[in-house]
Structures are given as C-alpha cells and as structure tokens.
C-alpha cells in the first residue's frame, strides 16, 4: 500500500464524470489496487453527509434517495481497503494537535493515518494537508 485517498479524491471517483475524474482514473490505472486505500475517516465523512441529507428529507422520495446514497457509499468503500484510526494514528494525531496546526480535525486524522503508515495522501486540499510536517501529498486530478 502506497497511497491514501482523501475524501475529495474519493468523491471525484464517485462522480464518474468530468475532467478531474478522467485525470484521476488515468493516474490510478497503472497502479495495482493494492497500492490504494481509503480511511475510516473518509467513510465517516461520507456517511455523515448521508445522515445529514436524511435528517433534512421531508418526502418519501427524498428518504429513498438518501438511503440510496448511503448504499452507494457502502458499495464504493468495498473497492479498496479501509484503514482504521488505530493506536498508532491516535499517537500521531495527538502529536499533531499539540503543534496547534490550523487543520480541520478530520483532515488531521487522515494525515495521522497516512503518517503512521508511511503513505502518500492523494488530495486536492493542499492548503490543509500541506501544513502537516512530514506528510507527503499529491493531487492526481491535475
């Protein structure tokens, strides 16, 4: 395993269309699937989005659509290993928090998983992830 996809790259894959999707899938094509992983944090973010949609749903059609979105998220997360936020990541996360970085908590958790496992984060969010010392990031949508 070499690369950890941030939630933004996962979302682009879910769109299945557009220039960012085409570029990203082209960059992924030469790599074996074993090189790529998702994080439990990204799964959390996406299921939280589905939950928020369902909380706002007012019609049966919206509820059905919300659960359809949730099913799609579950299917999408079966195509690559989902890495846990384990003790090693928690230790790295605590050290990063102590540095008072101005990075959102979920992004910092993803960064901690990557640092604990020596992975490169694939993301378009260089403004946040670029602040994390020692973290390697790449944007495969450009």
Placement of each model-derived feature along the sequence:
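Acidic, PIN/NYN-like endoribonuclease modules and their adjacent C-terminal/linker elements
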Residues: 1-2, 111, 115-142
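Short, well-structured N-terminal submotif of metal-dependent ribonuclease cores
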Residues: 1-42, 52-71
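Histidine- and aromatic-rich ligand-binding microenvironments
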Residues: 5-6, 39, 103-104, 125, ...
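A generic structural signal for short hydrophobic patches within well-formed alpha-helices
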Residues: 10, 43-46, 90, 129
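Short, flexible helix/strand-to-coil boundary loops that buttress conserved ligand/catalytic motifs
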Residues: 14-17, 50, 97, 133, ...
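Active-site neighborhoods of divalent-metal-dependent phosphate/nucleic-acid chemistry enzymes
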Residues: 48-54, 75-122
């Amino acid at each position: 395993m070499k690369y950890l996809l941030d939630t933004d790259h996962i979302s682009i894959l879910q769109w299945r269309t557009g220039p960012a999707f085409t570029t990203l899938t082209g960059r992924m094509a030469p790599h074996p699937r074993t090189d790529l992983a998702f994080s439990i944090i990204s799964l959390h973010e996406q299921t939280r989005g589905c939950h928020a949609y369902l909380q706002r749903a007012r019609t049966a059609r919206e509820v059905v659509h919300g659960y359809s979105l949730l099913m799609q998220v579950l299917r999408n997360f079966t195509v690559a290993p989902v890495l846990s936020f384990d003790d090693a990541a928690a230790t790295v996360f605590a050290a990063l928090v102590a540095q008072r970085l101005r990075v959102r908590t979920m992004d910092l958790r993803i960064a901690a998983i990557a640092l604990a496992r020596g992975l490169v984060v694939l993301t378009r969010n260089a403004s946040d992830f670029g602040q994390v010392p020692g973290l390697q990031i790449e944007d495969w949508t450009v």
